[in-house]
């Protein structure tokens, strides 16, 4: 099986809660399943610390997705193209975002819903993106 992983939060030396959580889950999946190929989709140059396994293929996909407009491009245009190009069987996204245009099964985890409890703590465009897209992501056809 070819499993695509959203690796955009794997930034060596700059990871916080979501990055650490993402890496610990991905690392264990990769180590425990050497029979599968894992395609790590990064949005910028990556550290080889994340790609030392024989069953990992690292791929950088543009644009760097660090703003709501760029998230939209990355997830709705770049990710579906990459999934098709790399012939992924499933897409696992650990940051609460996924593509609404993918035709393969999706496994989505949502790290937190703080934007609902503390909307004023989140920048306007980020909050708007979460408010619009999180419900849509939760309605798509998951695994």
What are these regions (language model features)?
Residues 1-143:
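Carbohydrate transferase catalytic cores enriched for Leloir-type hexosyltransferases
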């Amino acid at each position: 099986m070819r499993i695509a992983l959203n690796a955009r939060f794997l930034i060596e030396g700059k990871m916080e809660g979501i990055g650490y959580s993402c890496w610990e889950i991905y690392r264990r999946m990769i180590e425990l399943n050497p029979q599968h190929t894992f395609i790590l989709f990064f949005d910028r140059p990556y550290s080889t610390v994340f790609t030392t396994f024989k069953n990992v293929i690292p791929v950088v996909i543009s644009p760097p997705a660090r703003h709501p407009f760029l998230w939209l491009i990355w997830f709705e245009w770049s990710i579906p193209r990459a999934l098709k190009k790399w012939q992924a069987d499933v897409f696992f996204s650990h940051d609460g975002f996924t593509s609404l245009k993918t035709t393969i099964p999706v496994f989505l985890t949502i790290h937190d819903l703080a934007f609902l409890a503390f909307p004023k703590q989140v920048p306007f465009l980020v909050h708007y993106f979460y408010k619009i897209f999180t419900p849509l992501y939760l309605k798509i056809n998951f695994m």
